[in-house]
């Protein structure tokens, strides 16, 4: 199933496309949260801290791969909007081949570097072996991560955001069931949790391939899956690399912040892990609203419909703002019962509540930055998204280092450092946006 987003009322199109993306990520975040709950309740605080301190490295690898898929998806959207199905086919097959080779090599490198990377980040010795084993199992399954993200990004580029949601829901249920079986029944601890993640992603890939074979004619390539168009590779790598680096830059900043948190003790680490799981409910849906606007804008850019490109951008910003207000209210007033889902120790709960309430007050800023970034991706200008993300992370890490390591502030230093990064990001993005509006690019 595909959806032409170059015709029809823009607001319903964007809302209907956005809802499955947001639901999919909320569902994924829910099972990630359940993941942490199962580890925390059935294995213990050390295992929860180990999984939490491993999560930024795992997410870095996943987001780097996802960024490549997102960049390639922009090219697919543009070709589909222009009505060039042959170009769509060649773009998809070329990305699949190049991505497979890269993912296998990347997986091997990540497995080899898991231990030295965690040591570099000052992970405490008592949880280091747990964290290393968890990461290596997850990294071994990166080929499944690539194929799911690639197929899902391609379906979204063609206007189908619902199918990926259904497959993700099935995968999430399988992951939770696997967690309970491997962790509670077999007693495999955090390693069982990691294995469940890999197996559920493999199942999700299989479901996507079966669906594409039966329901999406433009992707029924058969032997044409083996077609490699070297003329498309340079642009694909350019878009994919810029998008991957933007995603990776954000995660590298989070890893640097995690390293600073690791100096604050196990209680702060556990509180930060629990709070960050909930914090993701704000950021990731905001990113997906931006991705929805990117798809609509890219399709209409390919079709040469500049007026719809502009309207799609501003509609995306409105949706971002509404979501930010809703999640701010929820996280601020329900902080304590939410944190208690992850931990029982009073010290951990108290630190987590303080973090979550403070950071929720700033949620409107990332909503605006994600909306603007979605717009620039839709225009094909990935350099601005990369530069602004680098500025954001540099400001965040520098502020966190000053607040924690020099001024010796406690966990509340982290939300303030986030705000510093977002302010710098807006100071860079807003003038660039104004220039695009004035010169007619947008």
Protein language model regions, located:
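Short runs within selected transmembrane alpha-helices of multi-pass transporters and secretion channels
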Residues: 69, 137-156, 164-172, 193-208, ...
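Helix-terminus/linker motif at the lipid-water interface of multi-pass membrane proteins
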Residues: 26, 30-49, 118-125, 181-188, ...
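Alpha-helical transmembrane segments and their lipid-water interface positions
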Residues: 28, 32-39, 62-69, 73, ...
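N-terminal transmembrane alpha-helices
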Residues: 5-43, 59-71, 75, 100-107, ...
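Short alpha-helical transmembrane segments in multi-pass integral membrane proteins
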Residues: 1-18, 76-141, 185-241, 297-362, ...
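Transmembrane helical elements of multi-pass membrane transporters/channels
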Residues: 16-35, 137, 148, 171, ...
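Small-residue hotspots at the loop-to-helix junctions and early N-terminal turns
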Residues: 43-56, 131, 135, 194, ...
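Small-residue-rich hydrophobic transmembrane alpha-helices
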Residues: 48-108, 145-164, 271-335, 366-380, ...
């Amino acid at each position: 199933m595909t959806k032409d987003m170059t015709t029809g009322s823009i607001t319903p199109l964007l809302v209907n496309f956005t809802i499955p993306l947001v639901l999919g990520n909320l569902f994924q975040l829910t099972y990630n949260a359940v993941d942490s709950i199962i580890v925390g309740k059935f294995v213990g605080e050390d295992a929860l801290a180990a999984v939490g301190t491993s999560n930024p490295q795992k997410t870095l690898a996943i987001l780097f791969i996802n960024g490549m898929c997102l960049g390639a998806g922009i090219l697919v959207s543009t070709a589909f909007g222009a009505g060039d199905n042959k170009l769509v086919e060649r773009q998809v097959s070329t990305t699949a081949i190049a991505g497979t080779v890269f993912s296998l090599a990347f997986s091997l490198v990540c497995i080899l570097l898991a231990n030295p990377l965690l040591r570099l980040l000052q992970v405490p010795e008592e949880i280091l072996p747990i964290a290393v084993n968890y990461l290596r199992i997850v990294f071994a399954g990166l080929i499944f991560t690539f194929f799911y993200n690639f197929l899902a990004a391609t379906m979204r580029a063609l206007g189908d955001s619902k199918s990926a949601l259904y497959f993700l829901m099935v995968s999430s249920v399988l992951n939770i069931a696997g967690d309970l079986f491997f962790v509670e029944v077999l007693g495999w601890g955090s390693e069982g949790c990691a294995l469940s993640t890999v197996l559920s992603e493999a199942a999700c890939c299989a479901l996507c391939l079966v669906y594409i074979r039966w329901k999406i004619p433009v992707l029924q390539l058969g032997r044409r899956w083996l077609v490699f168009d070297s003329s498309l590779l340079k642009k694909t790598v350019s878009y994919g690399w810029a998008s991957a680096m933007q995603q990776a830059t954000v995660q590298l900043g989070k890893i640097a912040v995690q390293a600073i948190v690791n100096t604050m003790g196990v209680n702060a680490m556990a509180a930060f892990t629990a709070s960050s799981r909930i914090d993701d409910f704000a950021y990731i849906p905001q990113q997906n609203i931006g991705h929805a606007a990117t798809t609509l804008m890219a399709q209409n850019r390919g079709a040469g419909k500049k007026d719809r490109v502009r309207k799609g951008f501003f509609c995306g910003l409105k949706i971002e703002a509404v979501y930010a207000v809703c999640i701010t209210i929820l996280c601020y007033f329900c902080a304590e019962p939410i944190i208690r889902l992850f931990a029982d120790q009073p010290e951990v709960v108290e630190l987590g509540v303080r973090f979550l309430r403070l950071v929720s007050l700033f949620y409107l800023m990332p909503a605006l930055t994600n909306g603007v970034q979605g717009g620039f991706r839709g225009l094909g200008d990935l350099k601005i998204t990369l530069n602004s993300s680098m500025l954001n992370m540099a400001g965040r890490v520098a502020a966190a280092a000053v607040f924690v390591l020099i001024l010796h502030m406690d966990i509340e230093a982290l939300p303030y450092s986030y705000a510093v990064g977002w302010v710098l990001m807006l100071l860079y993005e807003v003038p660039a946006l104004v220039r695009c509006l004035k010169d007619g690019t947008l």
